[in-house]
Regions:
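Outer-membrane beta-barrel pore domains
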Residues: 94, 98-239
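Surface-exposed coil loops of outer-membrane beta-barrel proteins
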Residues: 1-88, 105-108, 113
Length: 239
């Protein structure tokens, strides 16, 4: 889901940073046990997976669902389930266009039991993402746009904050942090191979002059949005 989980090797991004926005709001190099189906038909590559859901106890205002795939225990719980899918298209020479999505429940995916008042709380998480890459004419251009909605965010925040922190005997591994109901990340980077203009180097090496711009918010909507305005970040980088 997202560019960061499909194309995360060092030659898939400029500088030493992956997409900072996606890295903040999504699990990175996301791996979970599940059942997966993938393949390719002509210019289309597809992949789908059924797996356990994320753990809402690990969510937070400045990381959204980033830590949801981790576990504070020596094992990973699977009380709730989720599905994800991805399609990559290569119809245009040198260009990849991608769509990916995720949907699943996140609440009660922990050892902590909830009272009957939370029976209808599921913490449904939906993520949609678009990505692109172009490698032509000595240019590399990459872009990503990811949006997510989390249902029951306020009710889950109340549930998490009702328990002591993990440092106490009966504590919870929760971050005790408000959880956003929406988060987003958009980014664009472009680099030009300047060695392509030097005949003695054009066939041997590559040196890219690049720039990147990102705009992301891990607390784009929520009851305490005013208090967490700093979770919106605009970032520029050149190299």
């Amino acid at each position: 889901v997202g560019e960061i989980n499909a194309y995360h090797m060092p030659n898939d991004f400029f500088s030493v940073y992956r997409s900072e926005g996606e890295a903040k709001m999504l699990p990175n190099t996301w791996h979970q046990v599940g059942i997966s189906l993938w393949g390719r038909i002509s210019d289309w590559r597809y992949e789908a997976i059924f797996t356990s859901g994320l753990d809402a106890e690990r969510f937070g205002h400045n990381c959204y669902v980033h830590y949801g795939a981790t576990s504070p225990y020596e094992y990973k719980l699977g009380n709730v389930y989720a599905g994800a899918a991805r399609i990559d298209n290569y119809s245009i020479p040198g260009v990849r266009l991608s769509l990916s999505g995720y949907y699943g429940y996140t609440f009660k995916n922990t050892e902590r039991k909830a009272s009957a008042s939370y029976d209808k709380v599921h913490g449904a998480l939906a993520i949609g993402s678009f990505g692109l890459e172009m490698k032509r004419w000595n240019w590399i251009v990459r872009g990503n746009a990811t949006y997510s909605h989390l249902a029951d965010a306020q009710k889950m925040t109340t549930f998490m904050n009702a328990y002591p922190k993990h440092t106490q005997q009966d504590g919870s591994p929760s971050k005790h942090s408000p959880i956003a109901s929406n988060a987003y990340s958009v980014g664009l980077e472009a680099g030009y191979n300047i060695f392509s203009q030097i005949s003695s180097l054009s066939d041997k090496q590559k040196l890219y002059l690049f720039g990147r711009y990102e705009d992301y918010n891990t607390y784009a909507a929520g009851k305490q949005k005013v208090a967490y305005k700093y979770d919106r970040v605009k970032r520029m980088a050149v190299g």
